């Protein structure tokens, strides 16, 4: 099974992942949540990056839903290490209690960079992405999360320049994010 790294790519001594336990899943997340502890050594293959920052991009808009924050957080950590703070994150979750990395994202390192949207599990409270994408900017967009959220971002950003909007899919269904 593949998992997105959420650690800074510059940190080569360890890999950090975050896995949401899915009782309805095929067992991978249950095993990771129930049988693996922080600090355990696991046999892994070398990372592959199919969702990388565009090398010439200088401004970034990140959109994450639920545990889709993992690759986005890695990118944000990398940009901060590089001295680039030209980014913004829109992070959609059910509620603050289920928001991964909430404390870090509310901390001083990302102050003023993160907008949280909590739908409380009601699709009628999903974020309206049109105001975000109505006017294209020179930012590159990186989106990872549930299929429904990614479809909404794709629909709202269809008029953006080709190659400016990037998606990472990891098999989450279209239920509320």
Positions of predicted regions on the chain:
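Histidine-anchored nucleotide/phosphate-binding helix
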Residues: 69-81
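Short, glycine-rich nucleotide/cofactor-binding loops
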Residues: 60-70
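Short, conserved phosphate/pyrophosphate- and ester-handling motifs at nucleotide-, phospho-/glycolipid
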Residues: 5, 68, 146
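Reductase modules of NAD(P)H-dependent flavoproteins
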Residues: 93-177
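Conserved S-adenosyl-L-methionine
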Residues: 57, 78-87
